Amino acid sequence: MKKSENKKARFLTAVVASPEGEIFELDGYAAVGMAGKLRVPLSVEETLPLPYGTELLFLPDRNPIMYNLLTRKIETLVENPYRPGETIFPVAAFNSPGFIITYVSAYKEKRNSVQLPLFSYGAVGWHQKGFRSASICVDRERRQDLRLMPIQKVEAGIHRMQQRLPSNRLREHLENCAMMYGCPAAKNFFLGRYEAPLPTATTCNARCVGCISLQGEGNISNCQERIKFTPQPEEISALALEHIRNVKHAVLSFGQGCEGDPLLAADVIAPAIQSIRARTDKGTINMNTNGSRPEILEKLFNIGLDSVRVSMNSVRENCYKGYFRPRTYRFADVVESIDLAKRMGRFVSINYLNCPGFTDSPEEIHALISFLKSHPVDLIQWRNLNIDPIKYLRLMNKTSNHSRPIGIKMVLDKIKTQFPKLKYGYFNPPKETFYEMV
């Protein structure tokens, strides 16, 4: 990567990719981010150095949009302006965990463009000594910092667990997650750190457009394979108890990217929780879920479930249904699960899926503030929605009208002003820190 010669520029220098995937700068042009129909040149002041572990992606079948510093106009480039006839592609950042994007990489689709794979596509540019990302850090914990997950230690942990749990199918499944898919949650189990995943459910009662474990026929493939068996309660509890023994303030989470919804596997999860709690009161037992079955959730709370994280792309029913496409539950069931958890004194998070242009629309932020007043939660876990952003915005605009976005940073500030005790984060906290302010 060449260093930019324009060191005094307020704007980030635009970066593009060649057909071979080589990323380079375009002097004279500034990087642009987009949110809905809004196009914004990226500045140093509103971006961060590219977080460690972030991956850079180039976007096929698309033309980059950038800001011409000479004409002071937003332009769509169909070729390299310095090498006419040379094809160039937009570049996006798939940011590390804990960072949410404020703008999407700006581009225009070509005719008959293929849908983008299931990643988030943050805006990125170059300034002086490195790449910068249009993002905000919402969680500084190093739970999924790849620098703390050396492969030799992961392999050593796998060997130890093979000795400890030789015939445990769930342990075998997590080995595949760690080594085949590079899953940081699975790696943490074998490293004896933080949070252990407990994938259990083979089925789901939603058909999320951006489901990362099961996609129907089409051009998009799922990012990982859904678990193909239901672990026995004994397999679940044995693995969980190992993690509790190895980790101070351990977190155990049902509901992972490689499974359906855990509420549909309550027949094995309930006895597993009972078995864990019969042996120890240590460890935080958490469930990541769509919240579709409040009556089942209540039973799990009664036998030892400590916290719940409910996923939502929107608090507006039409927009929620447009993305989650629920099959056997209502939006009211999701809301009831949140209210139930608070009534029962449990720690409640919303897994709020972020896409600039929608999440920061006045309609969504107004609805979110109203929702939180009526249905309080303890934590918003901000996450980037892994989906083709233009396709997603088209889908959401079919469900509701959306005005000019106000910006993700302003969304965060507005909510914090309205609800000063509400926590922001990315990871499921242990019960020892449930009510510590950040």
Language model: regions and residue ranges:
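Catalytic cores of alpha/beta
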Residues: E295-N302, G357-S374
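Short, flexible helix-coil linker/hinge segments at the edges of structured domains or between repeats
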Residues: Q152-K187, I212-L239
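N-terminal pre-triad scaffold of radical SAM enzymes
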Residues: Y181-Q215, A250-F254
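Core AdoMet radical
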Residues: E195, P199, G216-A272, R277-I296, ...
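Active-site beta-loop-alpha junctions enriched in small/polar residues
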Residues: G257-E259, N290-S292, N313-V315, L353-C355, ...
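Auxiliary Fe-S-binding modules of radical SAM enzymes
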Residues: M1-L165, H366-V438
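Conserved strand-turn element in the central/C-terminal portion of the radical SAM core barrel
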Residues: R325-R327, S337-E364
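Alpha-helix-loop-beta-strand connector modules within alpha/beta enzyme cores
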Residues: A266-D281, A332-R346, S400-Y424
